[in-house]
């Protein structure tokens, strides 16, 4: 049955009620009710987020001790950096989250040793509170040597080595293109004994970074042509490593 639109006075009353109930979100509901879309396609295409991030997470097939989980963190960070290189991105911040297994509290021996904070997972089971930390890099980079080193330092600093680990999440924050990072001006405090010119050490560092970038691109080229397991590192063959197995999966399932 057709109904006439409410009067202007009634519309105002309804709008006031909506804003009282839903706050600023009421504006979206009102626009939707009238079939009005304030955002144009041009605005959607022109949108650029203030911050970007790239990351990966892994739920381990069984509880891992801290030393084995460290190998997985190294593998994940290595792969994350390769993904950045592939898309021409760099980062200056790494965030690491490590989730512990319920066995830390269900096993009487382990539970007796643990005196830290306890929380619950999404299934309502008690687990030790996860470890979480951030590592800031000196500048934007996609150097695996730099990023992996900082991530492992962060891992060693935040985890409890006595607990079993089940989940690992590694995220690269403040991600931007290499061109955007180069445009940004950086400043460094200098003393009277510093020289403005590039030192031999700085030149050597630049050359080392360039060589590493060339090696990373060569690795990507080989992987894209012959498969992800065509070129691996010694770390990937250590006990507890998961990269070789994960490379054969699609969406986390065996291909």
Predicted features by range, described:
Residues 124-255:
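Acidic, metal-coordinating catalytic segment for phosphate/diphosphate chemistry
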């Amino acid at each position: 049955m057709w109904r006439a639109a409410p009067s202007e006075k009634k519309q105002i009353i309804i709008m006031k009620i909506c804003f009282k109930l839903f706050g600023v979100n009421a504006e979206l509901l009102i626009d939707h009710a009238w079939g009005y879309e304030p955002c144009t396609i041009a605005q959607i295409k022109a949108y650029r987020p203030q911050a970007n991030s790239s990351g990966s997470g892994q739920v381990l097939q069984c509880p891992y001790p801290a030393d084995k989980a460290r190998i997985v963190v190294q593998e994940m960070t290595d792969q994350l950096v390769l993904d950045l290189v592939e898309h021409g991105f760099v980062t200056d911040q790494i965030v690491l989250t490590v989730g512990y297994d319920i066995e830390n509290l269900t096993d009487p021996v382990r539970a007796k040793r643990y005196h830290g904070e306890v929380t619950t997972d999404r299934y309502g089971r008690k687990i030790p509170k996860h470890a979480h930390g951030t590592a800031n890099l000196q500048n934007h980079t996609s150097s695996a040597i730099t990023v992996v080193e900082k991530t492992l330092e962060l891992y060693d600093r935040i985890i409890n080595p006595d607990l079993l680990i089940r989940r690992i999440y590694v995220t690269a924050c403040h991600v931007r293109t290499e061109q955007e990072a180069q445009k940004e001006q950086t400043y460094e405090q200098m003393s009277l004994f510093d020289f403005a010119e590039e030192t031999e050490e700085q030149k050597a560092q630049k050359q080392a970074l360039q060589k590493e970038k060339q090696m990373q691109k060569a690795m990507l080229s080989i992987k894209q042509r012959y498969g992800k397991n065509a070129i691996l590192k010694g770390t990937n063959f250590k006990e507890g490593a998961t990269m070789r197995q994960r490379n054969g999966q699609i969406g986390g399932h065996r291909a």
